[in-house]
Amino acid sequence: MVKGLYTAYTGMINEQKRLDVISNNLANANTTGFKKEGTTSEAFDSVLAYKIKDTTDPVKARNIGKMSLGVKIGESYTDFSEGSLRVTDNTYDLALTDKGFFSVEFTNKNGVSSTKYTRDGSFTVTREGNLVTKDGDFVLDNNGRRIKLDPNAEIVFGKNGTIYANGSPVAALGIKDFEDYNYLEHYGENYFQPVEGAKLKNAECDVLQGYLETSNIQVVSEMVQMISVTRAYETNQKLI
């Protein structure tokens, strides 16, 4: 009986985590460039069998017999598939047609700055001429420097990321990509940051001016999953 209660308990924890992720996806369905998150699940006894290992064999798990100890969250993942493009015709709205990220200088509450990466190209120019995100973070060029533009000039963004002011090239967007997206983690609402082991590479994408990339969230699919998860949670709750 105790094992049955524990199985239901771990099931509730698992479904609660899935529900949190789905809720966050739905909350960001209209967030520009947002990427869907998901979770995987695995049997708790499989994890335990891997952890309890015979020291004579560092790879093979020790045989511990039949168990039924419920389920646990495996790992979180991000779906980096592209969202659809929305026409805005705004000068500083940009979208990337393939894999790649805009480079942004983010400053936290402690005043520490670091480079983050985003697919959200809804930019603007300040009175001082700085190209910034909608949150006021500085957009960086291909050398990692802040981009300054003449607010009164006619600005055109080339497909390769080159920025033209009144027909003359003045800067180039810092568009970066990574060899393995498993080394990227979500940061805040719409940024990504590399973790140890991440390797940068040249981005092979085009820049489209006057467009924004929508999120890749399928609202109907997320709602169906939410109903399924809620029912599974209630079932485990009734067992307890």
Regions found by a protein language model. Give the residues of each.
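Amphipathic alpha-helical polymerization modules
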Residues: M1-I240
